[in-house]
Amino acid sequence: MIAILKPGTTPAQTDHLVSWLKAMNLDVHISHGEEVTILGLVGDTTRVDIDLLKSLEMVDTVKRVTEPFKQANRKFHPLDTIIEVGSARIGGGYFAMIAGPCSVESEAQIVEVAQAVKASGANLLRGGAFKPRTSPYAFQGMGAEGIRLLLKAKEATSLPIVTEIMNISTLDLFADVDVIQVGARNMQNFDLLKELGKTNKPILLKRGLANTIQELLMSAEYIMSEGNDKVILCERGIRTFETATRNTLDLSAVAVLHSLTHLPVVVDPSHATGKSELVPSMALAATAAGADGIMVEVHNNPAAALCDGAQSLTPAQLDELNRRVQRLREVLV
């Protein structure tokens, strides 16, 4: 349920109403817009006398929110959420380019790639330390050592870092990580999501390979319900009957998500296509669709990469892509 307050409602009136609602064991989320304030009510709202609430002097409108996701709902929070990560901003008209290798392989490799990422104009450095792989025999990442090397790369470039967590037991290792990524396979690992909700770190939440948009938003709700509203959604392709690409990039999800939620939406064309030659066109398409950012894989020697070399751009290709994205955004604005 949401209560839209009338323009000119004083802070004292708002505080009094919030206290009254909380006395009914409701969680109240306050969203200050340019003209009005919206109170989002979470809990057993059947106890609320809607007619009484509507009759209050400061209340303009009361509406029930029928969607199961509440805090992620644009009706609760009409203005776009802007998430700050270091000097980068994501959402609300701000665009982020996130780039880096699929896996951290060595200090020399990650620092070299990080320097190339920064030189290209990208905002954040991604890199895998813990790698969920389909095959148990594939490279699983460097683990804690990989995070240490990512921090070395951050020290060398000042780029904020993004890396994936796989289970709750390693959470302490992410204390100095700027953005924690939840991969597609863990999108519905609800225990993990709840623990991440207790942190104050931005969470990049990837859509599962066979999950609906509503399921993605409900996973975001798990994080937000624990107090962390710094959630970035990521479309990375879904599984369909098509085999020409690794996954099928659902670009319509960008527009649909923007209509349903205030959270930023980024797109990962590398995992969506699995082919480096397709990444630039899909990155541009995602930009045109209104994505708040792009996340691509980059390697200084893709042919020798320990994983996903086929979908990795070279630093020169990243430079060109970033230039094209910036030109496109200038036209779109």
Q: In which residue ranges do the predicted regions lie?
A:
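Non-catalytic terminal accessory/regulatory regions of metabolic enzymes
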Residues: M1-M97
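Active-site mouth loops of central-metabolism enzymes
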Residues: G8, F95-E112, P136-Q140, P160-E164, ...
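Active-site/ligand-binding-proximal alpha/beta "capping" segment
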Residues: V85, M224-A286
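Hydrophobic faces of well-ordered beta-strands that scaffold small-molecule active sites
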Residues: F95-P101, L125-G127, I161-T163, I180-V182, ...
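Glycine-enriched alpha-helix->loop->beta-strand junction motifs that scaffold or abut catalytic
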Residues: G121, L173-Q181, G197-I203, M224-K230, ...
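Glycine-rich, proline-tolerant flexible connector loops at the mouths of alpha/beta enzymes
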Residues: R126-A144, H299-S312
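Conserved anion-binding
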Residues: A129-R133, N186-S252
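Alpha-helix-loop-beta-strand connector modules within alpha/beta enzyme cores
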Residues: F139-T163, E195-P202, L251-V265, Q311-V333
